[in-house]
Amino acid sequence: PVLSTISSLDADSEADTLTLSGGQVTLTFNGPIAGEIALRAQDVTVFDFTLATQNNIEIKNLRFFATSSNHTDTSEGYPDFKVWDVEKNAVITSAVDLTTTSTSQTFTDTIQMSAGESRRFKVTVDGDADNDNGDSIDVALLAFVAGDIKNLDNNTNVAVADIVPNSTLDGNAMTVQAPTITLE
């Protein structure tokens, strides 16, 4: 057994303090962990996040950046890139096809949230049949800018300093894997 060398917390050096603080709008990255996308798969989750708000708000823009690798021809890509409300199992943005290796995508579909509400969202893509084993996609939610989120309680824009964290939330690489079967 491992025995403790500290029997009581009687000095500052024996304790740590952790302060967590949210903003008027708080973002949380939920995943997924790095994984695989099957060829011809539909609605594969490539980014999952939660938004929580103190006030009634309207989100005017969601900005994403998608990076894909190992594309060998122009027919490869990730079609049907869109955002869902996870709890409602409903698509909340228009869908776009990602056909280049680096793509910025801003969704301008308006999302309203009530004060005290926390909502989980996910970004999905389809696995294009032309993709090769080893092709991958990595999605990031870009930082909000002034005017992206409006506080409906006082009819002003939420200051970017009140969005926590207001930096890029990077997702994990999702790699194309062709299905295989082994018979013995």
Regions found by a protein language model. Give the residues of each.
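Exposed, polar/acidic Ser/Thr-rich sequence context and nearby capping/turn residues
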Residues: 1-184
